[in-house]
């Protein structure tokens, strides 16, 4: 009988169900007469404590690239690739490096050859490069161009005048260094401020291939032998900037050996106030090291970044490196400022060209493939050219803690 009752329960009249299930009375949260229970309101949470003041840390991701050495096959292919307003299109040369540059706030390069919009292009031994090359580098992300090297005087006074006009026509966010409009210009230190960090740029060269400055030149280089002038400039830059970056065109061509003159000048530059020293000219890789300046600062020196792009013909000349560092400025709560060069890494690059020095372009080693090595035009003379050979050259010349292959 009980089972029947349960199954029939849903059919009972509505009033029967309502009377059978008592309704709960709401609990009052109001105070009642003495002896009644009182429910208190929740207390408001205490405000979170103010965070402790922290030092201000400002950083710049900085890269430096070696010799942009434009031989005839490079500008001739650029002419064939051109369309639209430009007479030459060099973008193909740099398109594989542009994503890497985009990861940095500042990209510096040694512009080994004169760039102009006026002179006819020419190759070794006296170079002249279409201005469209520099514009392509600008599009790729380069903003700082070092102009002091052994080819600066290749076209004499007319070349200096033309290149000054060219660099005066490019966007204002470009910084050039290494050409000075006479002694009265030596006190004008190129400066750049990025992310609240001010960087000074100076560049010097060991020689100009025996071509002297003449009185009709509108600008001149400063030679590494002019140590009094260099000392004054570096010390002046030290007072103006958080970081002093010095490019030096020095050393022995096609030699991986750092000579005593390079080491001595690097130490002097560090003692005078340089924070980062970038070496170019040998066309091949040389090692890098930390130097301790007279005031205790740690100064990073890359003695040679090798070639960035060229159509030279030996494997060593086709393997360069891009330096990547972090420039960090820390302002303490008491106003004290500390500046440090951090995490230097040298990333190998490979200049690739096909048979007949065609289709010249540059890759980071980490993006280069064995298939590309097998199609490289250099294999005609060096059939063993391979990823293993490239790694071997890089490892033989760069300390392992500084080398980044992947």
Region annotations inferred by a language model:
Residues 5, 9-26, 35, 39-406:
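Acidic, metal/ion-coordinating pockets
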Residues 1-3:
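N-terminal Sec-pathway targeting helices
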């Amino acid at each position: 009988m009980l089972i029947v009752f349960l199954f029939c329960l849903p059919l009972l009249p509505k009033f029967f169900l309502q009377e059978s299930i008592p309704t709960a009375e709401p609990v009052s949260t109001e105070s009642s007469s003495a002896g009644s229970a009182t429910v208190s309101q929740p207390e408001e949470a205490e405000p979170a404590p103010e965070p402790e003041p922290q030092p201000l840390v400002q950083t710049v991701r900085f890269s430096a690239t070696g010799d942009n050495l434009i031989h005839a096959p490079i500008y001739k292919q650029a002419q064939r690739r051109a369309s639209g307003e430009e007479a030459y299109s060099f973008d193909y040369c740099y398109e594989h490096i542009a994503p890497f540059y985009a990861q940095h706030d500042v990209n510096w390069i040694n512009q080994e050859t004169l760039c102009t919009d006026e002179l006819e292009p020419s190759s070794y031994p006296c170079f002249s490069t279409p201005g469209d090359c520099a514009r392509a580098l600008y599009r790729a992300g380069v903003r700082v161009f070092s102009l002091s090297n052994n080819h600066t005087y290749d076209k004499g006074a007319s070349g200096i005048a033309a290149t000054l006009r060219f660099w005066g026509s490019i966007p204002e966010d470009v910084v050039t260094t290494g050409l000075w409009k006479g002694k009265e210009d030596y006190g004008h230190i190129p400066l750049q401020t990025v992310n609240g960090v001010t960087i000074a740029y100076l560049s010097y060269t060991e020689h100009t291939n025996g071509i002297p400055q003449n009185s009709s030149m509108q600008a001149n280089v400063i030679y590494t032998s002019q140590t009094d002038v260099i000392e004054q400039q570096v010390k002046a830059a030290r007072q103006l900037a958080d970081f002093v970056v010095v490019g030096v065109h020095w050393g022995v061509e096609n030699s991986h050996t750092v000579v005593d003159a390079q080491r001595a000048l690097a130490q002097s530059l560090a003692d005078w106030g340089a924070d980062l020293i970038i070496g170019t000219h040998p066309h091949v890789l040389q090692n890098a090291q930390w130097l301790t300046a007279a005031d205790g600062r740690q100064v990073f020196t890359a003695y040679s970044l090798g070639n960035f792009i060229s159509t030279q013909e030996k494997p060593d000349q086709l393997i360069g490196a891009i330096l990547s560092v972090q420039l960090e400025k820390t302002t303490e709560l008491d106003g004290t400022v500390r500046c440090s060069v951090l995490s230097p890494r040298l990333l190998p690059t490979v200049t690739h060209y096909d048979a007949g020095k065609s289709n010249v372009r540059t890759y980071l080693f980490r993006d280069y493939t064995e298939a590309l090595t097998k199609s490289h035009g250099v294999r005609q003379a060096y059939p063993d050219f391979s990823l293993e050979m490239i790694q071997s050259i890089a490892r033989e010349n760069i300390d392992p803690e500084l080398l980044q292959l992947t």
